[in-house]
Amino acid sequence: MNARLSLVLAVAVAITAGTFVTVATVAATRVSNVQIDDWQMQGTATHAAWPLWQLRVTSAFGNAAAREALADVLVNSTRLDERREGVELYRQLALDGAPRAQATLGHLLLRGLPGIAPDYVESRHWLTLAASHDSRDAQVAYDLATLYRNGYGMVRDASLAIRWLERAAQAGLPLAQFQLANEYRFGTSLPHDDALALQWLTRAANAELPEANLALAMAYRNGELGLARDESEYWAHVKESEHDLKHVSRQ
């Protein structure tokens, strides 16, 4: 009788536990992306335990968005062990074939984090994979340009660096547009071309890149890039660069 009762109780506990896991899994998968974004912002801004715990639990029950948000919060942590955990979580996501995680991991490994050294070889691996999914990703293209231009973890390749820099500029990344303008302006890795230099410099300035507006200001003051000297344009772009810097400092 006791054995039979024990069996019944064991079955009941198993059913209850299974029901709990099922309900928890369903609940986790139904958490809105807005809620996940809110936990992510709170966790990154305040490093509070509660939003991090929420992301951990939701991620543990199979919510893919929560898993990626958790990785982002962890790599921005003030604690080295959590930053390492975040990089490893991004690596797992990248291995699972998530293009955004591959792009982010490649960027992190290119720049490094406090206490975590860059790994240029692995960075190039993930960035190349990410680019194969989306060749229009401006940041991925720019990061690859940086690797090839500087010869990080490989032999320097100026032609590949320019190819990726052009992709990043065409995809709308202001810093890439500014650097491409300088390539045309100074004839470093591209033929000297003032018209193209001015075109890309203007696009970067219109995107509120401070150094682009300052460079454009000096071009007007000195009559460079085919521009006539113009003091009013010079001061207009100086003021615009100051505005851009204030905007950047508030971000």
Which stretches of residues belong to each language-model region?
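N-terminal Sec-pathway targeting helices
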Residues: 2-12
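Canonical positions in the second alpha-helix
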Residues: 56-58, 90-93, 129-130, 167-168, ...
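TPR/TPR-like (Sel1-like) alpha-helical repeat modules
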Residues: 199-202, 206, 214, 218-221, ...
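Hydrophobic face of amphipathic alpha-helices that form TPR/SEL1-like repeat modules
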Residues: 67-76, 104-112, 116, 141-150, ...
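Structural signature of tandem alpha-helical TPR/SEL1-like repeats
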Residues: 44-51, 80-89, 116-126, 155-164, ...
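N-terminal leader/linker segments that initiate helical-solenoid repeat arrays
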Residues: 18-76
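Short helix-capping/linker turns of helical repeat alpha-solenoids
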Residues: 60-64, 76-78, 95-99, 112-113, ...
